Amino acid sequence: MSMSVDSLKLVSERQHLVDVLMSGKQYADILLKGGNVVNVITREIYPADVAVSGKYILMVGDCEALTGPDTTVYDMTGKYVMPGFVDCHMHFESAMLTMTEFSRLSIPTGTTCLISDPHEIGNVLGPVGIKEMAKEASHMPQHVFCRVPALTPDS
Protein backbone atom coordinates (compact mmCIF):
# COMPACT_ATOMS: atom_id res chain seq x y z
CA MET A 1 0.00 0.00 0.00
CA SER A 2 1.49 3.34 -1.00
CA MET A 3 0.82 6.75 0.47
CA SER A 4 -0.34 9.66 -1.68
CA VAL A 5 1.93 12.65 -2.23
CA ASP A 6 -0.39 14.75 -0.03
CA SER A 7 -0.19 12.18 2.78
CA LEU A 8 3.60 12.10 2.57
CA LYS A 9 3.71 15.91 2.67
CA LEU A 10 1.48 15.96 5.76
CA VAL A 11 3.67 13.36 7.50
CA SER A 12 6.75 15.45 6.69
CA GLU A 13 5.12 18.65 8.01
CA ARG A 14 4.07 16.96 11.25
CA GLN A 15 7.52 15.41 11.71
CA HIS A 16 9.02 18.89 11.34
CA LEU A 17 6.73 20.19 14.11
CA VAL A 18 7.78 17.37 16.43
CA ASP A 19 11.43 18.07 15.62
CA VAL A 20 11.01 21.77 16.43
CA LEU A 21 9.34 21.02 19.76
CA MET A 22 11.69 18.24 20.82
CA SER A 23 15.08 19.43 19.62
CA GLY A 24 15.51 22.63 21.60
CA LYS A 25 17.60 23.77 18.63
CA GLN A 26 14.88 24.79 16.20
CA TYR A 27 12.59 27.74 16.74
CA ALA A 28 9.17 29.07 15.87
CA ASP A 29 8.80 31.27 12.81
CA ILE A 30 6.37 33.60 14.59
CA LEU A 31 5.69 34.31 18.25
CA LEU A 32 2.54 36.11 19.37
CA LYS A 33 3.78 37.26 22.78
CA GLY A 34 1.72 38.21 25.80
CA GLY A 35 -1.76 38.11 24.31
CA ASN A 36 -5.05 37.07 25.85
CA VAL A 37 -5.87 33.67 24.38
CA VAL A 38 -9.57 32.97 23.87
CA ASN A 39 -10.18 29.24 24.33
CA VAL A 40 -13.51 28.59 22.63
CA ILE A 41 -13.67 25.02 23.99
CA THR A 42 -13.25 25.80 27.71
CA ARG A 43 -14.76 29.30 27.43
CA GLU A 44 -11.71 30.79 29.14
CA ILE A 45 -9.57 33.82 28.39
CA TYR A 46 -6.03 33.63 29.77
CA PRO A 47 -2.64 35.25 29.15
CA ALA A 48 -0.34 33.16 26.95
CA ASP A 49 2.09 33.22 24.05
CA VAL A 50 1.36 31.44 20.78
CA ALA A 51 4.26 29.96 18.78
CA VAL A 52 3.75 29.27 15.06
CA SER A 53 5.85 27.25 12.62
CA GLY A 54 4.81 27.49 8.99
CA LYS A 55 1.04 27.20 8.95
CA TYR A 56 0.78 25.33 12.26
CA ILE A 57 0.45 26.39 15.89
CA LEU A 58 3.33 24.80 17.78
CA MET A 59 2.45 25.73 21.31
CA VAL A 60 0.20 27.89 23.46
CA GLY A 61 1.66 28.92 26.81
CA ASP A 62 5.14 30.06 27.80
CA CYS A 63 6.92 29.86 24.43
CA GLU A 64 10.19 31.57 25.38
CA ALA A 65 12.21 28.40 24.62
CA LEU A 66 10.87 28.42 21.04
CA THR A 67 12.05 31.98 20.37
CA GLY A 68 15.20 32.13 18.25
CA PRO A 69 17.19 34.82 16.46
CA ASP A 70 15.04 34.57 13.32
CA THR A 71 11.67 34.37 15.10
CA THR A 72 9.37 37.28 14.27
CA VAL A 73 7.87 38.45 17.58
CA TYR A 74 4.61 40.39 17.77
CA ASP A 75 3.71 42.14 21.03
CA MET A 76 0.10 41.16 21.69
CA THR A 77 -0.22 42.92 25.05
CA GLY A 78 -3.81 44.05 25.49
CA LYS A 79 -4.95 42.14 22.40
CA TYR A 80 -6.92 38.92 22.00
CA VAL A 81 -5.75 35.84 20.13
CA MET A 82 -8.42 33.39 18.99
CA PRO A 83 -9.16 30.89 16.26
CA GLY A 84 -10.94 32.08 13.16
CA PHE A 85 -14.70 31.85 13.05
CA VAL A 86 -16.48 29.26 10.90
CA ASP A 87 -19.81 30.28 9.38
CA CYS A 88 -21.17 26.75 9.18
CA HIS A 89 -24.39 27.38 7.23
CA MET A 90 -24.89 30.36 5.00
CA HIS A 91 -26.40 31.34 1.68
CA PHE A 92 -24.48 33.86 -0.41
CA GLU A 93 -27.59 34.38 -2.48
CA SER A 94 -29.69 35.43 0.54
CA ALA A 95 -27.10 38.06 1.40
CA MET A 96 -27.59 39.41 -2.14
CA LEU A 97 -23.81 39.69 -2.49
CA THR A 98 -21.32 37.92 -4.67
CA MET A 99 -19.05 35.47 -2.88
CA THR A 100 -16.14 37.85 -3.45
CA GLU A 101 -17.95 40.78 -1.84
CA PHE A 102 -19.24 38.67 1.06
CA SER A 103 -15.69 37.46 1.65
CA ARG A 104 -14.33 41.02 1.61
CA LEU A 105 -16.88 42.08 4.22
CA SER A 106 -16.59 39.02 6.49
CA ILE A 107 -12.79 38.78 6.75
CA PRO A 108 -12.54 41.77 9.15
CA THR A 109 -14.97 39.98 11.51
CA GLY A 110 -12.55 37.07 11.92
CA THR A 111 -14.47 34.67 9.68
CA THR A 112 -11.91 32.32 8.14
CA CYS A 113 -14.19 29.58 6.80
CA LEU A 114 -17.55 29.69 5.04
CA ILE A 115 -19.79 26.69 4.41
CA SER A 116 -22.32 27.56 1.75
CA ASP A 117 -25.62 25.88 1.01
CA PRO A 118 -26.23 26.91 -2.62
CA HIS A 119 -29.78 25.57 -2.93
CA GLU A 120 -31.09 28.93 -4.17
CA ILE A 121 -28.55 29.01 -7.00
CA GLY A 122 -29.40 25.35 -7.61
CA ASN A 123 -33.09 26.27 -7.92
CA VAL A 124 -32.37 28.94 -10.53
CA LEU A 125 -29.32 27.70 -12.44
CA GLY A 126 -29.05 24.02 -11.52
CA PRO A 127 -25.70 22.20 -11.50
CA VAL A 128 -24.11 24.84 -13.76
CA GLY A 129 -24.74 27.54 -11.13
CA ILE A 130 -23.41 25.39 -8.29
CA LYS A 131 -20.27 24.62 -10.32
CA GLU A 132 -19.76 28.34 -10.97
CA MET A 133 -20.07 29.04 -7.23
CA ALA A 134 -17.47 26.36 -6.52
CA LYS A 135 -15.17 27.91 -9.12
CA GLU A 136 -15.48 31.37 -7.52
CA ALA A 137 -14.94 29.81 -4.07
CA SER A 138 -11.55 28.51 -5.19
CA HIS A 139 -10.34 32.12 -5.51
CA MET A 140 -11.46 33.33 -2.06
CA PRO A 141 -8.89 34.12 0.66
CA GLN A 142 -11.05 32.23 3.15
CA HIS A 143 -11.74 28.51 3.09
CA VAL A 144 -15.08 28.14 1.30
CA PHE A 145 -16.91 24.84 1.10
CA CYS A 146 -20.07 24.34 -0.95
CA ARG A 147 -22.49 21.69 0.28
CA VAL A 148 -24.64 19.83 -2.16
CA PRO A 149 -28.28 20.67 -1.44
CA ALA A 150 -30.37 17.66 -0.47
CA LEU A 151 -33.38 18.88 -2.38
CA THR A 152 -33.64 21.39 -5.18
CA PRO A 153 -36.01 23.10 -5.50
CA ASP A 154 -36.43 23.47 -1.77
CA SER A 155 -39.85 22.27 -0.62
Regions inferred by a protein language model and the residue ranges of each:
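Short intrinsically disordered, low-complexity coil segments enriched in acidic
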Residues: M1-S2, A65
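Divalent-metal coordination cores built from histidine and acidic residues
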Residues: S2-L21, S103-S155
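Histidine-rich, glycine-flanked metal-binding segment
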Residues: L8-L31, N36-M82
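A sequence-composition feature that detects small, non-aromatic residues
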Residues: A28, A48-A51, A65, A95, ...
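Short glycine-rich, polar/acidic loop-and-turn segments at beta strand-coil junctions
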Residues: N36, G54-Y56, E64, M90-F92, ...
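Alpha-helix N-cap/helix-start motif
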Residues: I45, A95, N123-G126
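Short, low-complexity, polar/charged sequence segments that are solvent-exposed and flexible
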Residues: V50-L58, F92-S94, R104-I107, A134-K135
